[in-house]
Amino acid sequence: MSRSKRLQTGQLRARFAAGLSAMYAAEVPAYGTLVEVCAQVNSDYLTRHRRAERLGSLQRVTAERHGAIRVGNPAELAAVADLFAAFGMLPVGYYDLRTAESPIPVVSTAFRPIDANELAHNPFRVFTSMLAIEDRRYFDADLRTRVQTFLARRQLFDPALLAQARAIAADGGCDADDAPAFVAAAVAAFALSREPVEKSWYDELSRVSAVAADIAGVGSTHINHLTPRVLDIDDLYRRMTERGITMIDTIQGPPRTDGPDVLLRQTSFRALAEPRMFRDEDGTVTPGILRVRFGEVEARGVALTPRGRERYEAAMAAADPAAVWATHFPSTDAEMAAQGLAYYRGGDPSAPIVYEDFLPASAAGIFRSNLDRDSQTGDGPDDAGYNVDWLAGAIGRHIHDPYALYDALAQEERR
């Protein structure tokens, strides 16, 4: 008897990303429009720009997605880590959105591939946020206890699914015959639940933060947004607006310049009013709407070194970053490489290393642009103790340093 064909974790990841994209397009039709317009923009950009694929092949860019999910506590985050490991996605970076200009009561990491070949094959990544319930500025003792009790009662993932994920991660893949059911179950775990929402509990959490309500006010998690990659985000923004899609007011991240694109630029269409059922305190179930899910799009540039990141932060602190950009950054890749501001494979200015991660200010800005009001923060110090070491210990996994990963890629010779 011949042995069944095996699929590696990277192949499973490609199927997982495609499955989530298909599901989200069915749930949020405007996302399908976004993907369609991205494809048109990318095709047109490729015909106009000789070096359009300098930061990734069109095949990679077209397939590229990042997702965002939210969980409530370390146990749930650890379960997410176990599931994503089966797709070759490891935790990279630490983001504290409580420190943003518009604070959000979450701390986050991103699960993604870290190997260059895996990134080239399929770079799917998921920005994963955990509710910061230990922060007394948002949650007093009584509310914290009730949130903890609520989270302890729910189960985000079938234990059998997690057991299978751990086995696949340990083996580096699975038999092809087992893959469809596993991927389908993993995708289904992030579908929007149709269970009625307890209205009084959801409303109470909403007074703290709409994000807190989205995390701990419902019995499951879901894809909050999926994000295709586009080569010209300004053109994308214009085309979406022309189609009558309401976009947020700005493009988050660095300004458009004549020099090399750096880091990450993001925008989105506004969160849509989606019908949900609500359960009142007397048990009555009535229809209502929630605005929690939206469609984001991103354009990625070259990864900056710590020195380059310092200059970026200085430029973005200006009232008009575009006006001062040239005082912080040169206009060519050769100068960027010579000054040690960005990462290039083997030091070759013609081989930029794409930024694979996120910007906390942009993430918080996107979240805030799709909320009706700011989070309510109380007075007092931040004594919750959240940091990258705490998060790594809480989930029992090493959280990779993005700069160390870029340094390693930069040591490789150009292919």
Swiss-Prot record:
Coiled-coil zones: none
Alphabetical keyword list: Dioxygenase, Iron, Metal-binding, Oxidoreductase
Binding site for 2-oxoadipate: 66, 70, 225, 361
Ligand binding (Fe(2+)): 66, 225, 296
Site-annotated residues for Important for substrate specificity: 70
InterPro entries reported for this sequence: HGLS (IPR009770), YdcJ_bac-like (IPR047869)
Molecular function, one GO term: metal ion binding
Catalytic activity of the protein: 2-oxoadipate + O2 = (R)-2-hydroxyglutarate + CO2
Cofactor(s) for this UniProt protein: Fe(2+)
This enzyme's EC code(s): 1.13.11.93
Enzyme class: oxidoreductase
Function, as annotated: Catalyzes the decarboxylation and hydroxylation of 2-oxoadipate (2OA) to form D-2-hydroxyglutarate (D-2-HGA).
Family: Belongs to the 2-oxoadipate dioxygenase/decarboxylase family.
UniProt-recorded name of the protein: 2-oxoadipate dioxygenase/decarboxylase
